[in-house]
Amino acid sequence: FRVGRKSVYLLGKQGQEPNDSMDYKGLTIHYYNKPPVRPNMLYRWLNYQGYRRKRQIQDSAGIARQRSMQSLYSLYRQTRIQERLASVGIFRYAEMQYIPRDTAFVSDTLDVRVIAALDKPYDAELDFNVTMKSNNQTGPGAAFTVTKNNVFGGGESWNVKLNGSYEWQTGKASSSLMNSYELGISTSLIFPRVVFPRMGDREYDFPATTTFRLYADQMNRAKYYKLLAFGGNVTYDFQPKSTSRHSIT
Protein backbone atom coordinates (compact mmCIF):
# COMPACT_ATOMS: atom_id res chain seq x y z
CA PHE A 1 0.00 0.00 0.00
CA ARG A 2 0.99 3.60 -0.60
CA VAL A 3 0.27 6.55 1.65
CA GLY A 4 -2.03 9.15 0.12
CA ARG A 5 -3.60 12.25 1.64
CA LYS A 6 -2.77 13.14 5.24
CA SER A 7 -5.12 15.03 7.54
CA VAL A 8 -5.28 15.99 11.23
CA TYR A 9 -8.44 16.62 13.25
CA LEU A 10 -7.78 18.64 16.42
CA LEU A 11 -10.77 18.64 18.75
CA GLY A 12 -11.61 21.64 20.91
CA LYS A 13 -10.93 21.89 24.65
CA GLN A 14 -14.41 20.57 25.42
CA GLY A 15 -14.32 17.97 22.64
CA GLN A 16 -15.87 20.25 20.01
CA GLU A 17 -15.69 19.13 16.40
CA PRO A 18 -13.40 21.16 14.10
CA ASN A 19 -15.11 24.07 12.32
CA ASP A 20 -12.24 25.31 10.15
CA SER A 21 -9.28 23.94 8.23
CA MET A 22 -6.04 24.87 6.51
CA ASP A 23 -3.46 23.21 4.26
CA TYR A 24 0.25 23.14 5.09
CA LYS A 25 2.60 21.42 2.62
CA GLY A 26 -0.04 18.88 1.68
CA LEU A 27 -1.16 18.26 5.28
CA THR A 28 -4.80 19.22 5.89
CA ILE A 29 -5.31 20.50 9.44
CA HIS A 30 -8.85 20.70 10.84
CA TYR A 31 -9.27 22.68 14.07
CA TYR A 32 -11.82 24.39 16.30
CA ASN A 33 -11.73 28.23 16.17
CA LYS A 34 -7.90 28.52 15.95
CA PRO A 35 -5.03 26.02 15.58
CA PRO A 36 -3.75 25.04 19.06
CA VAL A 37 -0.53 23.65 17.54
CA ARG A 38 1.73 25.33 15.01
CA PRO A 39 1.24 23.82 11.52
CA ASN A 40 4.99 23.41 10.94
CA MET A 41 5.31 21.28 14.09
CA LEU A 42 2.38 19.05 13.13
CA TYR A 43 4.01 18.58 9.74
CA ARG A 44 7.33 17.61 11.37
CA TRP A 45 5.68 15.08 13.67
CA LEU A 46 3.55 13.56 10.92
CA ASN A 47 5.97 13.82 8.01
CA TYR A 48 5.72 10.22 6.89
CA GLN A 49 8.75 10.46 4.62
CA GLY A 50 10.87 11.79 7.48
CA TYR A 51 10.73 8.51 9.42
CA ARG A 52 12.70 5.88 7.57
CA ARG A 53 15.52 3.56 8.41
CA LYS A 54 18.94 5.12 7.95
CA ARG A 55 20.20 1.95 6.32
CA GLN A 56 17.58 2.04 3.57
CA ILE A 57 19.28 1.03 0.31
CA GLN A 58 19.33 3.69 -2.39
CA ASP A 59 20.37 2.48 -5.81
CA SER A 60 21.91 4.49 -8.61
CA ALA A 61 18.56 4.77 -10.38
CA GLY A 62 18.19 8.02 -8.49
CA ILE A 63 15.59 10.13 -6.80
CA ALA A 64 12.50 8.64 -8.46
CA ARG A 65 13.02 5.24 -6.84
CA GLN A 66 13.82 6.82 -3.47
CA ARG A 67 10.63 8.87 -3.48
CA SER A 68 8.62 5.84 -4.55
CA MET A 69 9.92 3.82 -1.61
CA GLN A 70 9.23 6.66 0.82
CA SER A 71 5.55 6.77 -0.15
CA LEU A 72 5.04 3.10 0.76
CA TYR A 73 3.24 2.24 3.99
CA SER A 74 5.62 1.14 6.73
CA LEU A 75 4.81 -0.18 10.20
CA TYR A 76 8.17 1.20 11.34
CA ARG A 77 7.19 4.73 10.31
CA GLN A 78 3.73 4.39 11.82
CA THR A 79 5.25 3.35 15.15
CA ARG A 80 7.68 6.29 15.11
CA ILE A 81 4.86 8.76 14.49
CA GLN A 82 2.74 7.30 17.29
CA GLU A 83 5.72 7.49 19.66
CA ARG A 84 6.31 11.11 18.69
CA LEU A 85 2.71 12.13 19.31
CA ALA A 86 2.80 10.43 22.71
CA SER A 87 6.19 11.86 23.72
CA VAL A 88 5.34 15.54 23.16
CA GLY A 89 2.96 15.24 26.11
CA ILE A 90 0.29 17.71 24.97
CA PHE A 91 -2.35 15.29 23.68
CA ARG A 92 -4.94 13.61 25.88
CA TYR A 93 -5.27 11.01 23.18
CA ALA A 94 -4.25 10.62 19.55
CA GLU A 95 -5.64 8.04 17.14
CA MET A 96 -4.21 7.19 13.72
CA GLN A 97 -6.54 5.80 11.06
CA TYR A 98 -5.52 4.34 7.70
CA ILE A 99 -8.50 4.54 5.35
CA PRO A 100 -8.47 2.66 2.02
CA ARG A 101 -9.31 5.01 -0.80
CA ASP A 102 -11.16 2.14 -2.49
CA THR A 103 -13.02 -0.34 -0.28
CA ALA A 104 -12.80 -2.94 -3.06
CA PHE A 105 -9.00 -2.64 -2.83
CA VAL A 106 -8.72 -1.80 -6.51
CA SER A 107 -6.60 1.18 -5.45
CA ASP A 108 -3.47 0.59 -3.37
CA THR A 109 -3.66 4.00 -1.64
CA LEU A 110 -4.30 4.56 2.07
CA ASP A 111 -5.28 8.00 3.35
CA VAL A 112 -3.96 8.83 6.82
CA ARG A 113 -6.21 10.54 9.36
CA VAL A 114 -5.11 11.58 12.85
CA ILE A 115 -7.75 12.49 15.44
CA ALA A 116 -6.34 14.15 18.56
CA ALA A 117 -7.49 16.08 21.61
CA LEU A 118 -5.19 18.29 23.63
CA ASP A 119 -4.60 17.70 27.31
CA LYS A 120 -5.16 20.30 30.02
CA PRO A 121 -2.98 23.41 29.60
CA TYR A 122 -1.77 23.38 33.23
CA ASP A 123 -0.48 20.73 35.60
CA ALA A 124 0.26 21.13 39.30
CA GLU A 125 2.09 18.81 41.67
CA LEU A 126 2.58 19.02 45.44
CA ASP A 127 4.98 16.73 47.31
CA PHE A 128 5.58 16.34 51.05
CA ASN A 129 8.31 14.39 52.80
CA VAL A 130 9.85 13.90 56.24
CA THR A 131 13.61 13.48 56.66
CA MET A 132 15.34 11.65 59.50
CA LYS A 133 19.16 11.72 59.51
CA SER A 134 21.80 9.80 61.45
CA ASN A 135 22.91 13.02 63.22
CA ASN A 136 19.49 13.17 64.91
CA GLN A 137 18.22 15.91 62.62
CA THR A 138 14.66 15.53 61.45
CA GLY A 139 12.08 17.71 59.78
CA PRO A 140 9.55 18.18 56.97
CA GLY A 141 10.04 19.22 53.38
CA ALA A 142 7.75 20.21 50.54
CA ALA A 143 7.89 20.96 46.82
CA PHE A 144 5.28 22.60 44.60
CA THR A 145 5.51 22.52 40.79
CA VAL A 146 3.32 24.27 38.22
CA THR A 147 3.68 23.37 34.53
CA LYS A 148 2.29 25.20 31.49
CA ASN A 149 1.94 22.84 28.54
CA ASN A 150 2.25 23.70 24.84
CA VAL A 151 3.70 27.13 25.63
CA PHE A 152 4.62 28.17 22.08
CA GLY A 153 2.27 25.84 20.23
CA GLY A 154 4.96 23.29 19.47
CA GLY A 155 4.74 20.90 22.42
CA GLU A 156 7.00 22.96 24.67
CA SER A 157 6.42 22.99 28.43
CA TRP A 158 7.47 25.53 31.05
CA ASN A 159 7.49 24.79 34.77
CA VAL A 160 8.29 26.60 38.01
CA LYS A 161 9.22 24.65 41.13
CA LEU A 162 9.35 25.92 44.72
CA ASN A 163 10.90 23.72 47.37
CA GLY A 164 11.77 24.08 51.02
CA SER A 165 12.74 22.04 54.06
CA TYR A 166 13.31 22.61 57.77
CA GLU A 167 15.26 20.35 60.10
CA TRP A 168 16.03 20.47 63.78
CA GLN A 169 18.33 18.35 65.88
CA THR A 170 16.57 16.39 68.60
CA GLY A 171 18.13 16.01 72.02
CA LYS A 172 18.32 17.56 75.47
CA ALA A 173 21.69 19.25 75.07
CA SER A 174 22.36 22.64 73.56
CA SER A 175 22.81 20.93 70.20
CA SER A 176 19.05 20.74 70.02
CA LEU A 177 19.10 24.42 69.02
CA MET A 178 20.91 23.58 65.76
CA ASN A 179 18.13 24.16 63.29
CA SER A 180 18.68 24.13 59.51
CA TYR A 181 16.59 25.14 56.54
CA GLU A 182 16.73 25.20 52.76
CA LEU A 183 14.72 27.20 50.24
CA GLY A 184 14.89 26.94 46.48
CA ILE A 185 13.27 27.96 43.24
CA SER A 186 13.87 26.64 39.75
CA THR A 187 12.34 27.05 36.32
CA SER A 188 12.70 24.87 33.24
CA LEU A 189 11.73 25.24 29.59
CA ILE A 190 11.51 21.89 27.79
CA PHE A 191 11.42 21.45 24.01
CA PRO A 192 10.38 18.05 22.55
CA ARG A 193 13.25 18.20 20.06
CA VAL A 194 16.94 19.09 19.80
CA VAL A 195 17.39 22.88 19.86
CA PHE A 196 20.86 23.60 18.51
CA PRO A 197 22.27 25.59 15.55
CA ARG A 198 22.10 23.58 12.32
CA MET A 199 20.31 20.76 14.16
CA GLY A 200 17.01 22.45 14.97
CA ASP A 201 15.29 21.16 11.83
CA ARG A 202 16.47 17.59 12.29
CA GLU A 203 14.03 14.99 13.56
CA TYR A 204 15.33 11.79 15.10
CA ASP A 205 13.44 8.55 14.64
CA PHE A 206 13.11 8.38 18.42
CA PRO A 207 12.00 11.06 20.93
CA ALA A 208 14.44 13.82 21.86
CA THR A 209 14.25 16.74 24.31
CA THR A 210 16.15 19.93 25.13
CA THR A 211 15.84 21.37 28.65
CA PHE A 212 16.90 24.89 29.66
CA ARG A 213 17.00 25.27 33.46
CA LEU A 214 17.68 28.12 35.90
CA TYR A 215 17.78 27.69 39.67
CA ALA A 216 18.56 29.43 42.97
CA ASP A 217 18.99 27.84 46.41
CA GLN A 218 19.43 29.31 49.89
CA MET A 219 20.86 26.84 52.42
CA ASN A 220 21.49 27.41 56.12
CA ARG A 221 23.29 24.88 58.31
CA ALA A 222 23.17 26.22 61.86
CA LYS A 223 26.60 26.90 63.41
CA TYR A 224 28.29 25.66 60.23
CA TYR A 225 27.65 27.75 57.12
CA LYS A 226 25.20 29.61 54.92
CA LEU A 227 25.18 29.09 51.19
CA LEU A 228 23.48 30.91 48.33
CA ALA A 229 23.76 29.08 45.02
CA PHE A 230 22.34 29.94 41.64
CA GLY A 231 23.03 28.87 38.09
CA GLY A 232 21.65 27.20 35.01
CA ASN A 233 22.23 24.41 32.55
CA VAL A 234 21.13 22.99 29.23
CA THR A 235 20.47 19.27 28.81
CA TYR A 236 20.13 17.42 25.52
CA ASP A 237 18.52 13.97 25.55
CA PHE A 238 18.33 12.14 22.25
CA GLN A 239 18.23 8.62 20.91
CA PRO A 240 19.73 8.28 17.42
CA LYS A 241 18.85 4.58 17.25
CA SER A 242 16.96 1.99 19.27
CA THR A 243 20.08 0.60 20.98
CA SER A 244 21.72 3.84 22.13
CA ARG A 245 20.63 6.91 24.06
CA HIS A 246 22.67 10.04 24.86
CA SER A 247 22.34 12.78 27.47
CA ILE A 248 24.59 15.86 27.33
CA THR A 249 24.51 18.64 29.95
What are these regions (language model features)?
Residues 1-3:
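Non-catalytic accessory/assembly modules
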Residues 7, 16, 22-34:
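Conserved oxyanion/phosphate-binding beta-strand-loop segments in alpha/beta enzyme cores
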Residues 9-10, 115:
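Generic structural detector for well-ordered beta-strands
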Residues 11, 28-45:
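Flexible hinge/switch segments at interdomain interfaces of large molecular machines
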Residues 12-20, 33, 46, 50:
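Structured extracytoplasmic
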Residues 23-25, 40-52, 61-67:
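Acidic/histidine-rich, surface-exposed loop or edge segments in extracytoplasmic proteins
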Residues 30-32, 51, 71-72:
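Mature-chain termini and adjacent capping regions
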Residues 35-38, 57, 66-249:
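Gram-negative/organellar outer-membrane beta-barrel architecture
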